[in-house]
Regions:
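N-terminal subdomain of nucleotide-sugar transferases
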Residues: 1-52, 59-61
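Conserved donor-binding/catalytic core segment of Leloir-type glycosyltransferases
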Residues: 5, 186, 190, 196-215, ...
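Glycosyltransferase donor-sugar binding loop
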Residues: 42-46, 208, 234-251, 265-267
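Membrane-proximal helix-turn-helix segments that form the acceptor-binding/catalytic region
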Residues: 140-158
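Aromatic "clamp/platform" in nucleotide-sugar-dependent glycosyltransferases that forms part
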Residues: 289
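Short hydrophobic beta-strand element within catalytic cores of glycosyltransferases
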Residues: 302, 306-310
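A charged, aromatic-enriched C-terminal amphipathic alpha-helix characteristic of glycosyltransferases
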Residues: 343-379
């Protein structure tokens, strides 16, 4: 069985780092019958300093069949350790998640090259999108300039999830040695339609995302200011407050609402709990500035719930598919759509839910995607 050595800043049981953790967890869940995974990660949750209590640090932990995880402490991360792990595992592939981490992106590339690993993959995980680079842009642009100057990414294979991400990589990195395009895996799950009552002119909306500029939380809240007073909206926010100043701006908007709009900040929840929570709402409301994949969008479909999202994600033409809306970032467009959904009768709303579930079924039962990954890790052919 071929061995894949993975480097990622945060991994399960952590969940607060969002999409990259979910992407890697789903990949392992779908492929661990075909490959042995060795995952190197931090022994702490995102933005926390206390180590996990249910893992053993600085040694391999049995995580799942054919999956081992090495949770390393802050004082242990080094080029020397990474080289030692590479020598002990003898991987066929080194697979690196992310771009801007010195310890879990740059050092692993250096270690793998020094140990003459034949195949090194980098998955940017959306970090080279314009919306992502725009956050703390000066630091990121300097970082990328240094990687180009030092030719860090020479002779690296890239894993992008779609053509748009491929264009982002070429625009920021330059000429690439090799690229594979393979979409993210969904969470493994049994899908079913659990209906929800749809009272006239009343909506329960939810968002599962960091409270941060790139997720456009402030825009979402400002959009609600334009919703008609005839519509009653309850909007629950799940996610980490990433920036206190940004959250204060959000609270300033919330303070302006009339009685028909109610916003609740719920806080951070484990991503494993998301599917069971979404079906208590009528729709996901997430007008983010950009998503490389948007796991929570797919999970809304898996819960048979439509979405109201921006047109800056891979999930497009949703109104045509009668499964939701993907809109340009214009506040009044979102407000009118919320009013439209609120006025929708039960039978029409149920059609939206069923169509959302159909999108999920197509994504979950995608044998071609599994074949694409198998070929990606086994073959040298570039496509």
């Amino acid at each position: 069985m071929r061995k894949i050595l993975v480097f990622i800043d945060w991994f399960l049981p952590g969940y607060k780092a969002g999409g990259p953790v979910r992407s890697m967890a789903n990949m392992v869940e779908h492929l661990n019958n075909d490959f042995s995974f060795y995952i190197v990660t931090r022994n702490t949750e995102y933005l926390e300093t206390e180590p996990y209590t249910d893992v053993i640090s600085n040694q391999w932990n049995d995580f799942a069949p054919n999956v081992k995880v090495f949770y390393t402490g802050n004082n242990k991360k080094s080029l020397r350790l990474w080289r030692k792990l590479i020598r002990s595992v003898k991987p066929d592939v080194v697979y690196i998640n992310g771009i801007y981490s010195p310890y879990f992106s740059i050092l692993p590339i250096r270690a793998a090259k020094l140990e003459k690993v034949d195949r090194i993959y980098v998955a940017p995980r959306g970090m080279l999108a314009a919306s992502a680079i725009g956050v703390k842009s000066f630091r990121k642009k300097i970082f990328l300039a240094i990687t180009r100057l030092l030719r860090i990414y020479d002779n690296i294979e890239w894993h992008t999830t779609n053509e748009k991400e491929l264009r982002n990589v070429i625009e920021t990195i330059g000429e690439l040695s090799s690229v594979r395009i393979a979409d993210n895996f969904p969470r493994k799950a049994e899908l079913s339609f659990i209906p929800i009552d749809k009272a006239p002119m009343k909506l329960r909306l939810c968002s599962f995302a960091r409270i941060a500029p790139e997720k456009n939380t402030l825009f979402a809240l400002q959009s609600l200011l334009s919703v008609s007073g005839k519509v009653s909206v309850e909007f629950d926010l799940y996610g980490q407050i990433y920036d206190a100043d940004y959250w204060q701006k959000c609270k300033n908007v919330i303070a302006q609402y009339s009685e028909n709009i109610k916003v609740n900040y719920i806080g951070v929840i484990n991503s494993d709990d998301v599917p069971g929570i979404i079906n208590a709402y009528h729709a996901l409301f997430l007008p983010s500035r950009g998503e490389n994949f948007g796991h929570v969008i797919l999970e809304s479909f898996m819960a048979a719930r439509p979405v109201i999202i921006s047109d800056q994600t891979p999930w497009r033409n949703l109104e045509e598919k009668q499964a939701g809306w993907d809109l340009p970032l214009v506040e009044t467009r979102f407000a009118k759509t919320i009013e439209q959904l609120a006025a929708m009768p039960q039978n029409e709303f149920d059609v939206l839910c069923q169509n959302a579930l159909s999108i999920a079924n197509e994504a979950v039962n995608n044998e071609r995607l599994i074949s694409t990954y198998k070929n990606m890790f086994k073959s040298w052919e570039v496509y």
